[in-house]
UniProtKB/Swiss-Prot annotation:
<dbReference type="GO" id="GO:0046872">
    <property type="term" value="F:metal ion binding"/>
</dbReference>
<comment type="function">
    <text>Major role in the synthesis of nucleoside triphosphates other than ATP. The ATP gamma phosphate is transferred to the NDP beta phosphate via a ping-pong mechanism, using a phosphorylated active-site intermediate.</text>
</comment>
<keyword id="KW-0808">Transferase</keyword>
<feature type="binding site">
    <location>
        <position position="87"/>
    </location>
    <ligand>
        <name>ATP</name>
    </ligand>
</feature>
<dbReference type="InterPro" id="IPR001564">
    <property type="entry name" value="Nucleoside_diP_kinase"/>
</dbReference>
<dbReference type="InterPro" id="IPR036850">
    <property type="entry name" value="NDK-like_dom_sf"/>
</dbReference>
<keyword id="KW-0067">ATP-binding</keyword>
<comment type="similarity">
    <text>Belongs to the NDK family.</text>
</comment>
<dbReference type="GO" id="GO:0004550">
    <property type="term" value="F:nucleoside diphosphate kinase activity"/>
</dbReference>
<feature type="active site" description="Pros-phosphohistidine intermediate">
    <location>
        <position position="117"/>
    </location>
</feature>
<feature type="binding site">
    <location>
        <position position="93"/>
    </location>
    <ligand>
        <name>ATP</name>
    </ligand>
</feature>
<keyword id="KW-0460">Magnesium</keyword>
<dbReference type="GO" id="GO:0005737">
    <property type="term" value="C:cytoplasm"/>
</dbReference>
<keyword id="KW-0546">Nucleotide metabolism</keyword>
<keyword id="KW-0479">Metal-binding</keyword>
<feature type="binding site">
    <location>
        <position position="11"/>
    </location>
    <ligand>
        <name>ATP</name>
    </ligand>
</feature>
<keyword id="KW-0418">Kinase</keyword>
Length: 146
């Protein structure tokens, strides 16, 4: 088995609506384990730095505005093929295109308030995890704690 780490962000809409537990149930049902987690409020500068890859895109200002509109929950998830597994459980970016049974298909309200962010590659996962967590803040990466 190939265990990987990926980053998850539960966006401000999830925190505001009080559905953190519901989102976590999808993550756990997919066989992913949370090995680091914290709630924080992103500054404008942090959000711009984190989403810098989208800086030239027309949605960048609204993305930064949304991500700084309230607290978020950042997590490191681990599991077999974690990047792909989490992207599958998140569903399509646009909730109207997301399959039922996915986080976005079941819970998201709009393309902006789409509940979650997940790393899109192993390379980005590594960078994104380091953006939010120091190595000592991440528990054992093996699902059985070994």
């Amino acid at each position: 088995m190939m265990f990987e780490k990926t980053l998850s962000i539960l966006k401000p809409d999830v925190v505001e609506r009080g559905i953190i537990g519901r989102v976590l149930s999808y993550i756990e049902a997919a066989g992913l384990r949370i090995v680091a987690q914290r709630m924080c409020a992103l500054s404008h500068e942090q959000a711009e730095a984190f989403y810098a890859v989208h800086k030239a895109r027309p949605f960048f200002p609204s993305l930064v505005g949304f991500m700084t509109s309230g607290p978020v929950v950042v997590q490191v998830l681990v599991g077999e093929s974690a990047v792909k597994t989490y992207r599958d459980v998140m569903g399509a970016t646009n909730p109207s295109e997301a399959a039922p049974g996915t986080i976005r298909g079941d819970l998201a309200e709009s393309i902006d308030a789409n509940c979650v962010h997940g790393s899109d590659s192993l390379e980005n996962a590594e960078w994104e995890i380091k953006f939010f967590f120091k190595e000592h803040e991440i528990m054992s990466s093996m699902p059985n704690g070994k």
